[in-house]
């Protein structure tokens, strides 16, 4: 199954490049929170690839949503199967609040064709624009009772549709045929409401806890990140995002390389924080700072200036 997942990652990366995206991967690590980051102008995506989407863990979904919020990106999972069979093209699925689709559906979405069908308990559904439904019904001089008779549903169901409830595919098609109008609520099914998620977490590593405290002192929303090639992500209220990794005396070259590539794709600053004092100012194109450096920096602008200077 891992071979199939790796093939799916390669297919997705090729598709993104063909559609004008800059991309970076994490090296096919099956336990990683994400597999690909991609950017095209202002579009930023953090993607996890699963052959079977039912294998998604809640902890992975949580980290993916948190990371996307901090990096001002859209999180999504690209898959191929559920426990019941192949993913249907043109349909968005959800697991633990994260949108999921096939490669073909995601490519269509990137090219402006927003899917409007989503998978829910018992089948596929379409969100109805209740206001348009009501307006069109009145234009045709149809009562709620008329519509309910045509559809074979209760008046209450029609009232719910007019209040924005979703309809099954069968009901939606019949309703569209009756009204001869586009009554789809064209919301972005890939949009995640992360405001309902509590991102507070216990931090067991004293170094990471210290770094987070120091970055928060500069007015940066700073969080730990797990199962990724870095440890901390911070952002301000404007357009600045920072990615940081804690390193020891012998940093892993592959980890640094991936960190640098991710920061290049997103055009965000990445830096390494050394646990001990070091003479090195950069490794692999990433600035190196110590805890002492962070303690002596006065504000956010000075921090960014030091990172950019040492990264050169």
Curated annotation (Swiss-Prot):
HTH cro/C1-type domain location: 133-186
DNA-binding region positions on the chain: 144-163
Domain of life: Archaea
GO molecular function: DNA binding; DNA-binding transcription factor activity
Disulfide bonds: none
InterPro entries in alphabetical order: Arc_TR_HTH, Cro/C1-type_HTH, Lambda_DNA-bd_dom_sf
SUPFAM superfamilies with a match to the protein in the record: lambda repressor-like DNA-binding domains
UniProt keywords, alphabetically: DNA-binding, Transcription, Transcription regulation
Keyword Ribosomal protein: no
HAMAP family noted in UniProt: HTH_type_cro_C1
Protein's recorded name: Putative HTH-type transcriptional regulatory protein TV0294
Lineage of source species: Archaea, Methanobacteriati, Thermoplasmatota, Thermoplasmata, Thermoplasmatales
């Amino acid at each position: 199954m891992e071979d199939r997942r790796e093939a799916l990652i390669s297919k997705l990366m090729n598709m993104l490049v063909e559609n004008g995206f800059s991309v970076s991967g994490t090296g096919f690590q099956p336990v990683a929170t994400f597999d690909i980051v991609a950017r095209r102008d202002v579009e930023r995506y953090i993607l996890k690839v699963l052959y079977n989407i039912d294998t998604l863990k809640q902890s992975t979904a949580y980290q993916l949503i948190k990371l996307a919020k901090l990096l001002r990106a859209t999180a999504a999972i690209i898959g191929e199967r559920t426990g019941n069979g192949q993913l249907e093209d043109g349909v968005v699925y959800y697991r633990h609040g994260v949108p999921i689709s096939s490669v073909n559906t995601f490519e269509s979405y990137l090219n402006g064709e927003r899917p409007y069908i989503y998978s829910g308990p018992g089948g596929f559904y379409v969100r109805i624009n209740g206001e348009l439904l009501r307006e069109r019904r009145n234009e045709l001089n149809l009562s709620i009772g008329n519509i309910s008779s045509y559809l074979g549903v209760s008046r209450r169901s029609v009232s719910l549709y007019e209040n924005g409830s979703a309809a099954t595919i069968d009901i939606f098609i019949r309703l569209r045929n009756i009204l001869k109008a586009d009554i789809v609520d064209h919301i972005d099914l890939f949009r995640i409401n992360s405001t309902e998620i509590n991102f507070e977490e216990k931090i067991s590593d004293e170094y990471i806890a210290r770094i987070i405290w120091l970055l928060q002192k500069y007015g940066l929303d700073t969080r730990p990140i797990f199962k990724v090639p870095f440890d901390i992500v911070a952002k301000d209220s404007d357009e600045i995002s920072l990615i940081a990794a804690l390193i020891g005396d012998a940093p892993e070259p592959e980890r640094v390389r991936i960190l640098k590539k991710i920061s290049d794709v997103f055009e965000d600053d990445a830096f390494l924080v050394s646990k001990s004092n070091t003479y090195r100012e950069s490794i692999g194109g990433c600035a190196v700072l110590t805890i002492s450096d962070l303690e002596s920096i006065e504000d956010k602008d000075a921090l960014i200036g030091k990172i950019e200077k040492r990264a050169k």
